[in-house]
């Protein structure tokens, strides 16, 4: 009899070890004329579960930024432990310009958390915030989970 859980683990391990062809963007496009800008942060927040968001205590940091607008989709790594990072100063300066756009709605998931990190990083987000974590149960209140 085959143990599917072991096979799943081995397949997952093999997939994790595969090389990928992803590379960090080499462009910093102007998104200030887009209809919407979607943004998601990846963070290192070691005491989140015990003490709450690290941005309140300067405990942790932004690791990378995923952003989309118009036809552009990109992920900007700035503090990954494994390397491959872009200049944090350059990325954050560009991000400030993109999010300082009061006429463009910003789409986020769990915006309260990401907005705290953006603010702590010196990025002032202007414009309407559309939070998919808030909107999802409004679309289907009977769904068990939105994770």
Predicted regions and their residues:
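Conserved RNase H-like, two-metal-ion catalytic cores of nucleic-acid enzymes
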Residues: 2-147
